[in-house]
Amino acid sequence: MIKIGAHMPISKGFDRVPKDTIDIGGNSFQIFPHNARSWQAKLPTDEMATKFKREMKKHRIDWENAFCHCGYLVNLASPKEDIWQKSVDLLKTEVEICRKLGIKYLNIHPGSHLGTGEEEGINRIARGLNEVLNNTEDVIILLENVSQKGGNIGYRLEHLKRIIDLVDQKDRVAITYDTCHGFDSGYDITKKEGVESLLSEIENLFGLERLKMIHLNDSKYPLGAAKDRHERIGSGFIGEAGFAVFFSFKEVQRVPWILETPGGNEEHAEDIKKVSEIIEKYRIEVD
Protein backbone atom coordinates (compact mmCIF):
# COMPACT_ATOMS: atom_id res chain seq x y z
CA MET A 1 0.00 0.00 0.00
CA ILE A 2 1.25 3.46 -0.91
CA LYS A 3 1.84 5.74 2.07
CA ILE A 4 0.63 9.17 1.00
CA GLY A 5 -0.68 12.41 2.45
CA ALA A 6 -0.07 16.14 2.50
CA HIS A 7 1.16 19.03 4.57
CA MET A 8 -1.88 19.66 6.78
CA PRO A 9 -3.11 22.80 8.55
CA ILE A 10 -3.11 22.92 12.37
CA SER A 11 -5.36 25.98 12.64
CA LYS A 12 -8.19 23.89 14.12
CA GLY A 13 -5.89 22.00 16.46
CA PHE A 14 -3.41 19.15 16.28
CA ASP A 15 -6.17 16.66 17.06
CA ARG A 16 -7.99 17.49 13.79
CA VAL A 17 -5.05 16.45 11.63
CA PRO A 18 -5.50 12.63 11.66
CA LYS A 19 -9.18 12.82 10.62
CA ASP A 20 -8.49 15.52 8.03
CA THR A 21 -5.76 13.29 6.62
CA ILE A 22 -8.16 10.37 6.21
CA ASP A 23 -10.78 12.70 4.71
CA ILE A 24 -8.47 13.71 1.84
CA GLY A 25 -7.67 10.07 1.10
CA GLY A 26 -4.34 10.00 2.91
CA ASN A 27 -2.69 7.85 5.54
CA SER A 28 0.36 10.04 6.20
CA PHE A 29 0.87 13.73 6.97
CA GLN A 30 3.23 16.58 7.72
CA ILE A 31 2.50 19.60 9.93
CA PHE A 32 4.18 22.69 11.24
CA PRO A 33 4.58 22.42 15.02
CA HIS A 34 3.62 26.11 15.42
CA ASN A 35 3.08 29.28 13.37
CA ALA A 36 5.74 28.77 10.70
CA ARG A 37 6.39 32.49 10.26
CA SER A 38 7.14 33.19 13.91
CA TRP A 39 10.15 32.75 16.19
CA GLN A 40 7.70 32.00 18.98
CA ALA A 41 6.67 28.43 19.74
CA LYS A 42 5.19 26.80 22.80
CA LEU A 43 4.63 23.24 23.85
CA PRO A 44 1.15 21.77 23.45
CA THR A 45 -0.70 21.17 26.70
CA ASP A 46 -1.00 17.67 28.10
CA GLU A 47 -4.65 17.67 27.03
CA MET A 48 -3.79 18.67 23.46
CA ALA A 49 -1.15 15.95 23.21
CA THR A 50 -3.50 13.32 24.64
CA LYS A 51 -6.26 14.24 22.18
CA PHE A 52 -3.84 14.11 19.27
CA LYS A 53 -2.53 10.67 20.23
CA ARG A 54 -6.08 9.40 20.69
CA GLU A 55 -7.02 10.58 17.19
CA MET A 56 -3.88 8.99 15.74
CA LYS A 57 -4.94 5.66 17.23
CA LYS A 58 -8.59 6.10 16.24
CA HIS A 59 -7.73 6.74 12.59
CA ARG A 60 -4.97 4.12 12.54
CA ILE A 61 -2.21 6.36 11.28
CA ASP A 62 1.23 4.81 11.70
CA TRP A 63 3.65 6.98 13.65
CA GLU A 64 6.28 6.28 10.97
CA ASN A 65 4.05 8.24 8.59
CA ALA A 66 3.75 11.40 10.74
CA PHE A 67 6.16 14.30 10.30
CA CYS A 68 6.74 17.85 11.49
CA HIS A 69 8.41 20.54 9.37
CA CYS A 70 10.48 23.31 10.94
CA GLY A 71 9.40 26.94 10.72
CA TYR A 72 10.32 29.13 7.76
CA LEU A 73 12.65 31.39 9.74
CA VAL A 74 15.13 28.70 10.77
CA ASN A 75 18.55 29.11 9.10
CA LEU A 76 21.35 27.11 10.69
CA ALA A 77 23.73 28.23 7.92
CA SER A 78 23.31 31.93 8.73
CA PRO A 79 26.55 33.86 9.33
CA LYS A 80 24.55 36.22 11.55
CA GLU A 81 25.13 34.91 15.05
CA ASP A 82 21.81 36.16 16.42
CA ILE A 83 19.84 34.41 13.64
CA TRP A 84 21.91 31.24 14.06
CA GLN A 85 21.24 31.18 17.81
CA LYS A 86 17.53 31.90 17.39
CA SER A 87 17.39 29.07 14.85
CA VAL A 88 19.05 26.66 17.27
CA ASP A 89 16.75 27.69 20.10
CA LEU A 90 13.62 27.37 17.95
CA LEU A 91 14.67 23.94 16.68
CA LYS A 92 15.15 22.76 20.26
CA THR A 93 11.58 23.83 21.03
CA GLU A 94 10.28 22.22 17.85
CA VAL A 95 11.96 18.95 18.82
CA GLU A 96 10.26 19.13 22.23
CA ILE A 97 6.89 19.76 20.56
CA CYS A 98 7.44 16.67 18.40
CA ARG A 99 8.36 14.63 21.47
CA LYS A 100 5.26 15.71 23.35
CA LEU A 101 3.00 14.89 20.40
CA GLY A 102 4.76 11.57 19.82
CA ILE A 103 6.02 12.54 16.35
CA LYS A 104 9.34 10.92 15.55
CA TYR A 105 10.60 13.09 12.68
CA LEU A 106 11.31 16.82 12.26
CA ASN A 107 12.11 17.92 8.70
CA ILE A 108 14.38 20.93 8.15
CA HIS A 109 15.89 22.85 5.25
CA PRO A 110 19.67 23.00 5.83
CA GLY A 111 19.76 26.77 5.28
CA SER A 112 21.43 29.49 3.23
CA HIS A 113 25.03 30.64 3.73
CA LEU A 114 24.06 34.13 2.48
CA GLY A 115 27.18 34.47 0.37
CA THR A 116 29.80 33.26 2.84
CA GLY A 117 30.40 29.98 1.01
CA GLU A 118 29.24 26.38 1.20
CA GLU A 119 31.99 25.09 3.48
CA GLU A 120 31.35 27.72 6.14
CA GLY A 121 27.62 27.16 5.84
CA ILE A 122 27.93 23.40 6.20
CA ASN A 123 30.10 23.81 9.28
CA ARG A 124 27.57 26.16 10.87
CA ILE A 125 24.69 23.77 10.11
CA ALA A 126 26.54 20.87 11.70
CA ARG A 127 27.45 22.97 14.74
CA GLY A 128 23.80 23.95 15.11
CA LEU A 129 22.56 20.39 14.74
CA ASN A 130 25.02 19.20 17.38
CA GLU A 131 23.75 21.91 19.72
CA VAL A 132 20.15 20.83 19.11
CA LEU A 133 20.71 17.08 19.24
CA ASN A 134 22.99 17.14 22.28
CA ASN A 135 20.35 19.01 24.26
CA THR A 136 17.28 17.00 23.20
CA GLU A 137 16.24 13.37 22.92
CA ASP A 138 14.56 10.85 20.63
CA VAL A 139 13.39 12.94 17.65
CA ILE A 140 15.17 12.38 14.33
CA ILE A 141 16.09 15.42 12.22
CA LEU A 142 15.43 15.00 8.49
CA LEU A 143 17.66 17.06 6.20
CA GLU A 144 15.80 17.97 3.01
CA ASN A 145 17.36 18.56 -0.39
CA VAL A 146 16.60 22.07 -1.62
CA SER A 147 16.53 24.07 -4.83
CA GLN A 148 19.74 25.41 -6.34
CA LYS A 149 19.13 29.10 -5.77
CA GLY A 150 20.76 31.84 -3.75
CA GLY A 151 23.11 30.52 -1.09
CA ASN A 152 21.08 27.38 -0.43
CA ILE A 153 22.95 24.39 0.95
CA GLY A 154 21.53 20.99 0.09
CA TYR A 155 20.85 21.30 -3.65
CA ARG A 156 23.30 18.43 -4.04
CA LEU A 157 22.83 15.34 -1.88
CA GLU A 158 26.56 15.40 -1.23
CA HIS A 159 25.99 18.56 0.86
CA LEU A 160 23.71 16.60 3.20
CA LYS A 161 26.35 13.87 3.51
CA ARG A 162 29.00 16.45 4.47
CA ILE A 163 26.68 17.79 7.17
CA ILE A 164 25.92 14.33 8.58
CA ASP A 165 29.65 13.51 8.65
CA LEU A 166 30.11 16.40 11.11
CA VAL A 167 27.17 15.46 13.36
CA ASP A 168 27.91 13.62 16.62
CA GLN A 169 24.61 11.72 16.91
CA LYS A 170 24.42 10.32 13.39
CA ASP A 171 21.64 7.93 14.39
CA ARG A 172 19.37 10.96 14.87
CA VAL A 173 19.83 12.38 11.38
CA ALA A 174 18.23 11.11 8.15
CA ILE A 175 17.00 12.65 4.88
CA THR A 176 13.95 13.77 2.92
CA TYR A 177 13.93 13.90 -0.88
CA ASP A 178 11.83 16.64 -2.51
CA THR A 179 10.98 15.82 -6.13
CA CYS A 180 10.53 19.45 -7.21
CA HIS A 181 13.72 20.65 -5.51
CA GLY A 182 15.66 17.76 -7.00
CA PHE A 183 14.27 18.33 -10.51
CA ASP A 184 15.01 22.03 -10.09
CA SER A 185 18.63 21.12 -9.29
CA GLY A 186 19.14 18.74 -12.21
CA TYR A 187 18.02 15.37 -10.82
CA ASP A 188 15.86 13.97 -13.64
CA ILE A 189 13.36 11.46 -12.24
CA THR A 190 11.33 11.36 -15.46
CA LYS A 191 13.68 8.72 -16.91
CA LYS A 192 14.44 5.26 -15.55
CA GLU A 193 18.19 5.84 -15.63
CA GLY A 194 17.71 9.12 -13.76
CA VAL A 195 15.85 7.43 -10.91
CA GLU A 196 18.40 4.61 -10.85
CA SER A 197 21.19 7.17 -10.58
CA LEU A 198 19.38 9.04 -7.79
CA LEU A 199 18.73 5.89 -5.76
CA SER A 200 22.32 4.75 -6.27
CA GLU A 201 23.57 8.11 -5.00
CA ILE A 202 21.33 7.93 -1.93
CA GLU A 203 22.48 4.37 -1.23
CA ASN A 204 26.16 5.24 -1.61
CA LEU A 205 26.00 8.45 0.44
CA PHE A 206 23.60 7.49 3.22
CA GLY A 207 22.12 4.04 2.72
CA LEU A 208 18.54 3.88 1.43
CA GLU A 209 17.28 3.14 4.95
CA ARG A 210 18.07 6.78 5.80
CA LEU A 211 15.51 8.04 3.28
CA LYS A 212 12.47 8.57 5.52
CA MET A 213 10.16 10.81 3.48
CA ILE A 214 9.55 12.02 -0.06
CA HIS A 215 8.05 15.45 -0.65
CA LEU A 216 5.96 14.73 -3.72
CA ASN A 217 5.74 17.88 -5.81
CA ASP A 218 5.63 18.57 -9.53
CA SER A 219 7.79 21.43 -10.86
CA LYS A 220 6.44 24.60 -12.45
CA TYR A 221 9.73 25.03 -14.33
CA PRO A 222 11.95 22.76 -16.47
CA LEU A 223 14.80 20.53 -15.32
CA GLY A 224 17.62 22.50 -13.70
CA ALA A 225 15.77 25.83 -13.71
CA ALA A 226 16.68 26.71 -10.10
CA LYS A 227 13.34 28.46 -9.55
CA ASP A 228 11.78 26.41 -6.69
CA ARG A 229 8.13 26.58 -7.69
CA HIS A 230 5.97 23.60 -6.77
CA GLU A 231 3.16 22.53 -9.10
CA ARG A 232 0.15 20.21 -8.86
CA ILE A 233 0.85 16.54 -9.60
CA GLY A 234 0.87 15.93 -13.35
CA SER A 235 0.55 19.63 -14.21
CA GLY A 236 4.24 20.51 -14.25
CA PHE A 237 7.42 19.54 -16.05
CA ILE A 238 7.76 16.20 -14.25
CA GLY A 239 4.27 15.31 -15.44
CA GLU A 240 2.21 12.15 -15.30
CA ALA A 241 4.62 10.07 -17.37
CA GLY A 242 7.58 11.27 -15.34
CA PHE A 243 5.94 10.40 -12.04
CA ALA A 244 4.93 7.01 -13.45
CA VAL A 245 8.62 6.23 -13.91
CA PHE A 246 9.43 7.41 -10.38
CA PHE A 247 6.51 5.52 -8.80
CA SER A 248 7.55 2.24 -10.42
CA PHE A 249 10.58 1.82 -8.15
CA LYS A 250 10.05 -0.28 -5.02
CA GLU A 251 12.62 1.84 -3.14
CA VAL A 252 10.37 4.85 -3.76
CA GLN A 253 7.17 3.02 -2.82
CA ARG A 254 8.39 2.08 0.67
CA VAL A 255 8.70 5.74 1.77
CA PRO A 256 5.79 8.04 2.76
CA TRP A 257 4.92 10.56 0.03
CA ILE A 258 3.91 13.98 1.36
CA LEU A 259 2.35 16.55 -0.97
CA GLU A 260 3.36 20.20 -0.70
CA THR A 261 1.55 21.14 -3.89
CA PRO A 262 -0.39 24.41 -4.31
CA GLY A 263 -3.79 24.63 -2.63
CA GLY A 264 -5.43 23.29 0.49
CA ASN A 265 -7.16 20.10 1.56
CA GLU A 266 -9.48 20.01 -1.46
CA GLU A 267 -6.62 20.32 -3.95
CA HIS A 268 -4.52 17.80 -2.02
CA ALA A 269 -7.39 15.31 -2.15
CA GLU A 270 -7.45 15.79 -5.93
CA ASP A 271 -3.68 15.30 -6.13
CA ILE A 272 -3.86 12.10 -4.08
CA LYS A 273 -6.53 10.88 -6.49
CA LYS A 274 -4.28 11.89 -9.39
CA VAL A 275 -1.45 9.77 -7.96
CA SER A 276 -3.80 6.77 -7.82
CA GLU A 277 -4.88 7.43 -11.40
CA ILE A 278 -1.26 7.51 -12.57
CA ILE A 279 -0.54 4.21 -10.81
CA GLU A 280 -3.60 2.63 -12.45
CA LYS A 281 -3.10 4.20 -15.89
CA TYR A 282 0.51 3.07 -16.16
CA ARG A 283 -0.20 -0.29 -14.52
CA ILE A 284 2.39 0.18 -11.82
CA GLU A 285 2.76 -2.77 -9.47
CA VAL A 286 2.48 -1.74 -5.83
CA ASP A 287 3.32 -4.02 -2.92
Swiss-Prot record:
Any GO BP annotation: base-excision repair
Catalytic activity, reaction form: Endonucleolytic cleavage to 5'-phosphooligonucleotide end-products
Pfam families associated with the record: AP_endonuc_2
Binding-site positions, Zn(2+) 2: 144, 178, 215, 260
Residues engaged in binding Zn(2+) 3: 181, 228, 230
One example GO MF annotation: zinc ion binding
Note describing how the cofactor binds: Binds 3 Zn(2+) ions.
Family under the similarity heading: Belongs to the AP endonuclease 2 family.
Protein name as annotated: Probable endonuclease 4
Gene name as annotated: nfo
